[in-house]
Every structure is written in structure tokens, then in C-alpha cells.
């Protein structure tokens, strides 16, 4: 007979059963998926000072991470990282880009760069609002 359990201490193996099951179903649903990783870095003397990463898939750029070292912020590097990711995504045939942030200030920056809010979730975590934004990449 099946038996339920609820735990704070699930094993890596138990969690792997869940994640692999979800991924297997997702891959089956997205049989025509064409995911390709994408990353952009700016280095100074060999150290990464800014960059972004994500993937292109289903005619969309999904930006997962965008980061600028604290001492290099507010001088346009974040905008440049996004521009470079978007340019490569266009070459790959992406029609739009999706990005998320928990920062109201960063959401305002993305808005100035042409991103439009598609969803906001107030009090998402710790009082922060989750901003989900999309930008058309077609000319």
C-alpha cells in the first residue's frame, strides 16, 4: 500500500526523482525545444567584472543572470551586457527577451531599456516585488 511522508530532510536521491521526473515531462512537452546556452562576460585584467547568462529557446531569450561588480555599477555596463545578449539572441532568431528581478530600481532600468512588465508579484519574498518583464527584439 502506498505510504505518504513529509520531510525537512529529503535525500539528494529522493529530490533527484522529482527533478528528473519534471524534466522528463517538460522535455516531452517541448519536443521541438532548441535550447542553446548564452553568456557574455567583461573582464578586466583577467577578472570578470560584468556579465550575463541564460539561453535562447522557442524564439525567446531567457536571461537568467545579469551581474556587475559593485565598484563598476552605474556606468552602463549592465545595459551593455543586455545589449550584447540581445544582439546574439537576434542572430539566433529570437523574437523577444524575458528577464526577472526583485529590485524595483533594476526593473525601472529594464523599463528604460524597452522591457515591459508582464507580471508583478508583490511581497514575493522578504517584502520584495518580483518583476517579470519582456522586450520585443524584432525591429
PLM feature spans:
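Conserved catalytic-core motifs of GNAT/GCN5-like acyltransferases
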Residues: 98-100, 116-134
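Conserved active-site tyrosine of GNAT-family acetyltransferases
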Residues: 18, 110, 115
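Conserved beta-strand in the GNAT
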Residues: 47-55, 60-67
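Conserved GNAT acetyl-CoA-binding A-motif
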Residues: 89-102
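Conserved N-terminal entry element of GNAT/NAT acetyltransferase domains
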Residues: 1-10, 139
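Conserved acetyl-CoA-binding loop-helix of GNAT-fold acetyltransferases
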Residues: 74-87, 112
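Conserved beta-hairpin
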Residues: 35-50
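Short glycine/proline-centered loop/turn elements that form peptide/ligand docking sites
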Residues: 78, 82, 103-106, 123-129
Amino acid at each position: 500500500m502506498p505510504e505518504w511522508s513529509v520531510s525537512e530532510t529529503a535525500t539528494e536521491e529522493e529530490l533527484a526523482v522529482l527533478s528528473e521526473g519534471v524534466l522528463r515531462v517538460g522535455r516531452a512537452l517541448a519536443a521541438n525545444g532548441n535550447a542553446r546556452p548564452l553568456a557574455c562576460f567583461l573582464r578586466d585584467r583577467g577578472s570578470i567584472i560584468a556579465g550575463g547568462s541564460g539561453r535562447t529557446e522557442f524564439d525567446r531569450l531567457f536571461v537568467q543572470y545579469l551581474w556587475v561588480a559593485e565598484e563598476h555599477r552605474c556606468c552602463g555596463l549592465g545595459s551593455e551586457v543586455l545589449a550584447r545578449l540581445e544582439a546574439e539572441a537576434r542572430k539566433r532568431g529570437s523574437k523577444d527577451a524575458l528577464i526577472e528581478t526583485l529590485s524595483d530600481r533594476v526593473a525601472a532600468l529594464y523599463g528604460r531599456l524597452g522591457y515591459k512588465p508582464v507580471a508583478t508579484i508583490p511581497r514575493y519574498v522578504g517584502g520584495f516585488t518580483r518583476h517579470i518583464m519582456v522586450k520585443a527584439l524584432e525591429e
